């Protein structure tokens, strides 16, 4: 099988698995606990719950899912990537279909366990989608668009959106549900932060005598540039060079392994980068 075809098949399979996990999580944990996840999924469940409780109208999850994702999907096609958006559409439609089709099943009625384990599962499923260049839809499209095309950190925007959802949920369905939903969202975010590292940056300081070779190696491995700085060892007063570069967190280990192979004597200091200004190459999404 052609390598590209094999890659796309694997991508589709992972998207399907993630959709199944999200749908099962909604039917077992989220619905049982009456929780409202963050982002578009939380808004969909909130709309469903409002219509069901106050208007006695049952709206299929799929219908709300498609309607709320219309504009984000357009943004994805127009500004992010067609394959990326098509895979995301697969996740959106399959998640909606399975959520409407699967029977509800109660694993536990303990709301704290539901909040924690539901959040763990949700974060894992979202990270699966992101690792294969897809999203679960909704605010994910907007977040990626703002961060990649406009250079805007969408965290505060998404946070504000979630606060509004939880405030409405608290007023209509009880503040205990809103507070437990915060635990769900926090757990999900922490799992996502651990598993998906592409948007996290790592700074490398490499003291070496093979600076040119290592700079080229970093570029060949990550397409990131490097800066070479002359330096002197304080103890032995020996001359060295420092290779300074910033890479994505998920590229960090592969760069360090490659540097070790090129120069076993290199001294490497790797540290998290909290803020970065200026041009930083990001792999195109498609």
What kind of feature is each model-predicted range?
Residues 27, 55, 117, 158-161, ...:
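Positively charged, small/polar-rich N-terminal and surface patches that mediate targeting and assembly
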């Amino acid at each position: 099988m052609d390598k590209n075809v094999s890659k796309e098949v694997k991508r589709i399979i992972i998207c399907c698995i993630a959709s199944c996990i999200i749908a099962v999580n909604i039917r077992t944990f989220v619905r049982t606990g009456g929780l409202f996840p963050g982002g578009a999924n939380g808004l969909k469940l909130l709309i469903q719950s409002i219509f069901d409780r106050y208007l006695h109208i049952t709206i299929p999850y799929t219908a709300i899912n498609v309607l709320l994702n219309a504009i984000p999907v357009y943004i994805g096609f127009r500004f992010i990537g067609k394959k990326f958006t098509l895979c995301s559409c697969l996740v959106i439609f399959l998640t909606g279909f399975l959520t409407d089709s699967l029977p509800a099943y109660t694993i536990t009625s303990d709301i704290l366990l539901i909040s924690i384990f539901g959040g763990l599962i949700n974060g894992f499923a979202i990270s699966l989608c992101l690792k294969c260049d897809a999203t679960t839809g909704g605010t994910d499209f907007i977040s990626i668009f703002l961060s990649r095309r406009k250079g805007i950190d969408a965290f505060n925007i998404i946070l504000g959106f979630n606060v509004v959802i939880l405030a409405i949920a608290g007023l209509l369905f009880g503040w205990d549900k809103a507070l437990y939903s915060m635990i769900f969202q926090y757990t999900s975010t922490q799992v996502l932060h651990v598993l998906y590292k592409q948007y996290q940056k790592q700074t490398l300081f490499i003291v070496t005598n093979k600076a040119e070779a290592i700079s080229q190696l970093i570029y060949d491995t990550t397409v990131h540039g490097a800066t070479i700085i002359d330096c002197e060892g304080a103890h032995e007063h020996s001359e060295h060079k420092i290779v300074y570069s910033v890479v994505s967190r998920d590229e960090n280990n592969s760069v360090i392994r490659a540097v070790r192979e090129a120069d076993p004597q290199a001294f490497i200091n790797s540290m998290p980068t909290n803020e970065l200004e200026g041009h930083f190459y990001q792999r195109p999404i498609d």
